[in-house]
């Protein structure tokens, strides 16, 4: 059994953020392959299913990004899933918009969600890095990742999500190079994302060393909040299945 994780912040407030592209990818996988419904378990929204005969558990943490390892670790221990059988989809500032890269192990690259998973499970899990581009200056990163995708970004975002969902069976078969090749052939990454003006974090959020956010004093998200956000994100971002 594989554990397939999408990273993001829970709730409609963050549903369209660039930082939530991992959630969007999990939603695209669920819809393309008929997996669901999602239910609340392991401090996350989870759904069991199969892709090309391979059993998997889709998981989107209901913790905030910086505590993603709590949910992933809990699910992995319960199902006795080794880190080598865990695939995490997440946003990547250092890749051009629409470009993806896959790697196993390595460092967190400044991504606090990945860092927290490493703290709970070690570094041996797989990462599918979904390029969102860089705003051009480190002072703009927080505003950029917590900003919603612009309409102009739909030109590469929806095709990337579609391609990931179309060819994900290759990842489950242990063929990451073929997966990357197929996604690249199906998409045409944008050359560069435009930087946004620097802004302060939203009220109730704290800046972290890696540019992610933690919500201060916020109530826990409702059990159905993330499922609704996943559905909303997919309806907005996926090209296929809409006639």
Swiss-Prot record:
Basic and acidic residues bias: start-end ranges: 189-206
Gene3D superfamilies assigned to the protein according to its UniProt record, in alphabetical order: Peptidyl-tRNA hydrolase (3.40.50.1470)
Annotated compartments: Cytoplasm
Highest rank taxon of the organism: Bacteria
Site (Stabilizes the basic form of H active site to accept a proton): 91
Cellular component terms (Gene Ontology): cytoplasm
Keywords linked to the UniProt accession: Cytoplasm, Hydrolase, RNA-binding, tRNA-binding
Active site, renumbered: 19 (proton acceptor)
UniProt KW Phosphoprotein keyword: no
Start and end residues of each stretch annotated as Disordered: 184-225
GO molecular function: peptidyl-tRNA hydrolase activity; tRNA binding
EC number: 3.1.1.29
Binding residues for tRNA: 14, 64, 66, 112
Reaction equation(s) it catalyzes: an N-acyl-L-alpha-aminoacyl-tRNA + H2O = an N-acyl-L-amino acid + a tRNA + H(+)
GO terms of biological process kind: protein quality control for misfolded or incompletely synthesized proteins; rescue of stalled ribosome
Family named by the database record: Belongs to the PTH family.
Assembly and binders: Monomer.
Family matches, as PANTHER family: PEPTIDYL-TRNA HYDROLASE (PTHR17224:SF1)
Function: Hydrolyzes ribosome-free peptidyl-tRNAs (with 1 or more amino acids incorporated), which drop off the ribosome during protein synthesis, or as a result of ribosome stalling. Catalyzes the release of premature peptidyl moieties from peptidyl-tRNA molecules trapped in stalled 50S ribosomal subunits, and thus maintains levels of free tRNAs and 50S ribosomes.
HAMAP family the record matches: Pept_tRNA_hydro_bact (MF_00083)
Name of the protein in question: Peptidyl-tRNA hydrolase
Organism: Rhodospirillum rubrum (strain ATCC 11170 / ATH 1.1.1 / DSM 467 / LMG 4362 / NCIMB 8255 / S1)
Gene behind this protein: pth
């Amino acid at each position: 059994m594989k554990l397939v994780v999408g990273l993001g912040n829970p709730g409609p407030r963050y549903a369209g953020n660039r930082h939530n592209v991992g959630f969007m990818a999990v939603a695209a996988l669920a819809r393309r392959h008929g997996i669901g419904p999602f239910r609340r378990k392991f401090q996350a929204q989870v759904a069991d299913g199969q892709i090309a005969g391979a059993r998997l558990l889709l998981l989107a943490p209901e913790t905030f990004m910086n505590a993603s390892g709590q949910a992933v670790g809990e699910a992995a221990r319960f199902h006795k899933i080794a880190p080598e059988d865990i695939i995490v989809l997440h946003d990547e500032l250092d890749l051009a918009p629409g470009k993806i890269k896959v790697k196993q192990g390595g460092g967190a690259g400044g991504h606090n969600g990945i860092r927290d998973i490493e703290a709970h499970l070690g570094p041996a899990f797989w990462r599918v890095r979904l390029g969102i581009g860089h705003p051009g200056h480190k002072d703009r990163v927080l505003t950029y990742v917590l900003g919603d995708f612009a309409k102009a970004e739909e030109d590469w975002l929806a095709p990337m999500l579609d391609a990931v969902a179309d060819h994900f069976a290759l990842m489950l078969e242990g063929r990451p190079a073929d997966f990357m090749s197929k996604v690249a052939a199906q998409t045409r990454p944008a050359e560069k994302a435009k930087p946004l003006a620097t802004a302060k974090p939203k009220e109730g959020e704290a800046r972290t060393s890696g540019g992610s956010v933690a919500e201060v004093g916020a109530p826990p998200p409702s059990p159905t909040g993330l499922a609704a956000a996943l559905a909303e994100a997919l309806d907005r971002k996926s090209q296929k299945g809409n006639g």
